[in-house]
């Protein structure tokens, strides 16, 4: 939570309507790039409904931070993201930090685990979430801090919740995850409100910042891979240290 506050306490709501919108941010909305008009010049007036929708079909009032904007594009954000990369021996510059090839969500998790006191027998740091997912799935470590639990299930504070991304967004089973080859995203669960049907989880490089995701659960109060197509969750890394 302390690290999240250093980034400005950004919140992203992941709803059952397939939305994923920033609801709280220390920064104003990024200025939209002008859209081309029919004659090839930049349009200055209001665009059509199609222009006002992002790539996921969400309306213009859904705040998002594209690459090159948001907290990671500030000097402070760059310095903090560079700290996370240092945990795996890398030193990207501030331009690289804002590029997809240097996505820093996995090294954020690695940094947090080391700060929490986990050693190499419990959790191995990695540049890819799939590295430590496979470690936990295959029982690689002598004293593992986590084991894999398939969904649907109810997360608990201290667990990691993970989803596939890109070409592997819709994986159906944790056995399909390849070590260092499957693009993924994982968040750290910090609170579960069963009455409201919401899980709160903190992750890095979410809308170009360390953000708290407020994730709506299914009708049974569980996390699953179907309730929100923005992040079709695949598994829980269950915390065995609690």
PLM features: residue spans?
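N-terminal capping segments
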Residues: 1-121
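Low-complexity, Gly/Ser/Thr/Pro-rich intrinsically disordered linker/tail segments
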Residues: 205, 209-242
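Assembly/interface hotspot detector across virion components, adhesins/toxins, and nucleic-acid enzymes
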Residues: 11, 189-192, 215
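Surface-exposed intrinsically disordered loops and tails
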Residues: 59-94, 134-146, 171-174, 178-179, ...
């Amino acid at each position: 939570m302390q690290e999240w506050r250093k980034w400005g306490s950004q919140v992203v709501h992941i709803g059952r309507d397939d939305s994923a919108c920033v609801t709280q941010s220390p920064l104003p909305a990024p200025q939209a790039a002008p859209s081309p008009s029919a004659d090839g010049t930049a349009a200055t007036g209001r665009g059509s409904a199609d222009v006002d929708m992002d790539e996921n079909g969400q309306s213009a009032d859904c705040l998002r931070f594209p690459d090159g904007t948001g907290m990671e594009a500030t000097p402070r954000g760059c310095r903090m993201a560079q700290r996370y990369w240092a945990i795996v021996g890398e030193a990207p510059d501030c331009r690289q930090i804002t590029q997809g090839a240097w996505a820093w969500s996995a090294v954020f998790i690695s940094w947090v685990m080391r700060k929490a006191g986990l050693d190499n027998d419990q959790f191995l740091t990695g540049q890819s979430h799939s590295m430590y997912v496979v470690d936990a799935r295959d029982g690689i470590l002598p004293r593992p801090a986590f084991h894999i639990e398939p969904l649907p299930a109810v997360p608990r504070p201290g667990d990691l919740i993970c989803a596939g991304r890109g070409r592997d967004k819709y994986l159906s089973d944790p056995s399909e995850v390849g070590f260092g080859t499957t693009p993924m995203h994982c968040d750290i669960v910090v609170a579960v409100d069963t009455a409201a049907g919401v899980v709160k989880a903190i992750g890095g490089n979410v809308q170009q910042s360390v953000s708290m995701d407020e994730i709506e659960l299914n009708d049974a109060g569980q996390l699953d891979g179907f309730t929100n197509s923005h992040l079709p969750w695949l598994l829980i890394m269950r915390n065995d240290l609690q």
